[in-house]
Swiss-Prot record:
Organism: Paramagnetospirillum magneticum (strain ATCC 700264 / AMB-1)
Gene3D superfamilies: 2.30.30.30
Protein name listed in UniProt: Large ribosomal subunit protein uL24
NCBIfam families reported in the protein's UniProt record: rplX_bact
GO cellular component annotations of the record: ribonucleoprotein complex; ribosome
Record flagged with keyword Nucleus: no
Family matches, as InterPro entries: KOW, Rib_uL2_dom2, Ribosomal_uL24, Ribosomal_uL24_CS, Ribosomal_uL24_KOW, Translation_prot_SH3-like_sf
Task of the protein: One of two assembly initiator proteins, it binds directly to the 5'-end of the 23S rRNA, where it nucleates assembly of the 50S subunit.
Amino acid sequence: MASMNVKKGDRVVVLAGKDKGKKGEVIAAMPSEQRVIVQGVNLVKRHTRPSATSQGGIVEKEASIHVSNVAHEDPKDGKATRIGHKILEDGRKVRVARRSGEVIDR
């Protein structure tokens, strides 16, 4: 299985589905399932039972979406971009936005 270009903490744009066009930060990445959880995107309602620790009721939380439905947000203009890799002079391998050439890795 191919590795994912999306990591926890990346800013992404949703390309398809009911939340198309929304932007958010990746909360969790699941490489084995090729899925990501994006903050504020794909919200679902969970009906939870009361327990000793939690009150219970209807809780709204983010569900995962497939990685093919998101793209990185270009640091320059905020639009969706593809990702390339580049080796810097100091030997570090970094991810770069194909749209602007801007380095995405922190």
